[in-house]
């Protein structure tokens, strides 16, 4: 079955694994999924990224992070913003601040995929892919 929105699929896999307290989750590898995973790791939502397989069967293995004695997920919510049917673009001044700066908006810019903070620093806008907090 064809996957028409691989970014939504990635976010759903991470969200489900996090809610079930799984150590890792596997995601089909692509340039976009690697970029999003690197931003999540840089922002502290994912512990480690590795790859398994080769060719078009390559998968990203994401090691999820939890906090505290009761292993609360560091990812509380992930929301897809720009969808295939309705793309959402923002300029530098229009980039959203998620929970007053506690969350992250992941932006696809002309300089690559980055967090909203990095996009503001570099003075670029782009497509708002998702919110993570």
UniProtKB/Swiss-Prot annotation:
Q: What processes in GO biological process is this protein linked to?
A: translation
This protein's record includes keyword RNA-binding: yes
- Write out the function statement from the record: One of the primary rRNA binding proteins, it binds directly to 16S rRNA central domain where it helps coordinate assembly of the platform of the 30S subunit.
Q: Which domain of life is it from?
A: Bacteria
* Residues in coiled coil: none
What protein name is recorded for this chain?
A: Small ribosomal subunit protein uS8
What InterPro entries has UniProt attached to this entry? Ribosomal_uS8, Ribosomal_uS8_CS, Ribosomal_uS8_sf
Where are the residues of the annotated region Disordered?
Answer: 1-29
Q: Which gene encodes it?
A: rpsH
Q: Which family does it belong to?
A: Belongs to the universal ribosomal protein uS8 family.
Report quaternary structure and partners.
Answer: Part of the 30S ribosomal subunit. Contacts proteins S5 and S12.
Biased composition annotated in UniProt, kind: Basic and acidic residues:
16-25
Keywords per UniProt: Ribonucleoprotein, Ribosomal protein, RNA-binding, rRNA-binding
Q: Which organism is it from?
A: Prochlorococcus marinus (strain MIT 9211)
The terms describing its cellular component in GO are: ribonucleoprotein complex; ribosome
Gene Ontology molecular function, alphabetical: rRNA binding; structural constituent of ribosome
């Amino acid at each position: 079955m064809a996957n028409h929105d691989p970014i939504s699929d990635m976010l759903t896999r991470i969200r489900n694994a996090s809610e079930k307290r799984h150590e890792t989750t596997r995601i089909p590898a692509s340039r976009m999924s690697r970029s999003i995973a690197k931003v999540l790791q840089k922002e502290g939502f994912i512990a480690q990224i590795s790859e398994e397989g080769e060719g078009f069967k390559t998968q990203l293995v994401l090691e999820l992070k939890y906090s505290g004695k009761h292993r609360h997920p560091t990812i509380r919510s992930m929301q897809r913003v720009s969808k295939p049917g309705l793309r959402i673009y923002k300029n530098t001044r229009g980039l959203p601040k998620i929970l007053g700066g506690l969350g992250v908006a992941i932006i696809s810019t002309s300089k690559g995929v980055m967090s909203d903070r990095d996009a503001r620093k570099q003075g670029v806008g782009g497509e708002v892919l998702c919110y993570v907090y």
